[in-house]
Amino acid sequence: MAVLLETTLGDVVIDLYTEERPRACLNFLKLCKIKYYNYCLIHNVQRDFIIQTGDPTGTGRGGESIFGQLYGDQASFFEAEKVPRIKHKKKGTVSMVNNGSDQHGSQFLITTGENLDYLDGVHTVFGEVTEGMDIVKKINETFVDKDFVPYQDIRINHTVILDDPFDDPPDLLIPDRSPEPTKEQLDSGRIGADEEIDDFKGRSAEEVEEIKAEKEAKTQAILLEMVGDLPDADIKPPENVLFVCKLNPVTTDEDLEIIFSRFGPIRSCEVIRDWKTGESLCYAFIEFEKEEDCEKAFFKMDNVLIDDRRIHVDFSQSVAKVKWKGKGGKYTKSDFKEYEKEQDKPANLVLKEKVKPKQDAKYDLILDEQGEDSKSSHSHTSKKHKKKTRHCSEEKEDEEYMPIKNPNQDIYREMGFGHYEEEESCWEKQKNEKRDRRQNRSRSRSRERDGHYSNSHKPKYQTEPYERERSRKRDRSRSPKKSKAKEKSKYR
């Protein structure tokens, strides 16, 4: 109960579960017997997931079962066998592909991943790969496009039945030999299965090494661009800049400019120094106005003795100061010096020796002579202040009890929902009543306070006549006999 698949990459042997899946195995064996799978494309390769094939059209939407070959289009698909349940646990599991309605045709898949539980109950497992897992691994690692179709054709060239326990149906037409492929089958619009992809064919070993070196340099440039060390992968260093190294630490910019200026005008000459200590790093960059002058200096000045040092001159490979598509450009020594100067500047903020006491702008200092008058004025102003604070507190309370306004309130009012207007009127009434209560309370309290204040703060010369009047009233209210006796006693 096994079938050998001869592919363009190698042979694969599949063992079938004929006892657990008799109908699916019968369908697969008889399709192999009539050479239905010959020259079928492997049209779906999803790495570490599945390899799908079995469609003669190569689109993934075709194919029919052996029963369709025998009984017509009404039998193109057969029902899936779900009992007993076999899971997609290991690599190399072979399953019939579900057409979307729990039916199978001719397409099947081989798993290239483990524990694919989401395939269980959807696609019917009917076998496993026992030989040729290395070929399955090769197919799994092939290059594919966005639709998971391989760029180079991978086909099933031939199928060989190693063991078939099922009898052939009476109307089954078995060909004597394998049929030849048609042009439509072989023309997939992609790289042919028998085509060799060799970029180095017909080239010498030196040319091959040069091509490899160029590819490696390009890869490294792209990597440096991704990291951020290069502004662009296609950028080239300037051809009018020389790199001079092995300098004496005492050599200055002016010395180098004077020496190299005999080859032509120089735009800039800079000895690179440590931005902290200012000491020379013993290398420099010299930029000429013309490339010809730069080439002359390169050939003439290499290994020349300057300040008791043999210098080395080469073309600069640095692109640090090159502006390219809005990128590039680095901080220079002068930038760091300016930054240090800004840091060394004294701050504008100054600490004060004493903190000024907080004073109210409405009140001034009071002299000792005006102590009594100040007390009365202070009490009067404090009353005003209390009244103001009370008024502010009332306004705050009104604000605190204000309801949260619905942003859709105006829209609802226009649409005719009147309950919002009723709620507003009720709220205004309640608000006015509360305000009246507060005002009445404040008035009564102020009256009581004013009466108490007037009685307690009246001077003595105002209280004496008041007491005399009260005594007179008392005398009048008494009986006339007693009053006459009192008068007589006065004149005795």
From Swiss-Prot:
Domain (PPIase cyclophilin-type) spans 1-161
One GO cellular component this record assigns the protein to is: nucleoplasm
Is Ubl conjugation included in the keywords of this UniProt record?
yes
For the modification Phosphothreonine, the affected residues are: 182
Q: Which UniProt keywords apply?
A: Isomerase, Isopeptide bond, Nucleus, Phosphoprotein, RNA-binding, Rotamase, Ubl conjugation
Name the residue ranges with Basic residues bias: 377-390, 473-485
A molecular function annotated in GO for this UniProt entry is: peptidyl-prolyl cis-trans isomerase activity
Annotated signal sequence range? none
**Residues of the RRM domain:** 240-318
State the family named in the UniProt similarity comment for this chain. Belongs to the cyclophilin-type PPIase family. PPIL4 subfamily.
The name this protein carries in UniProt is Peptidyl-prolyl cis-trans isomerase-like 4
Origin species, per record, is Mus musculus
Q: Which gene encodes it?
A: Ppil4
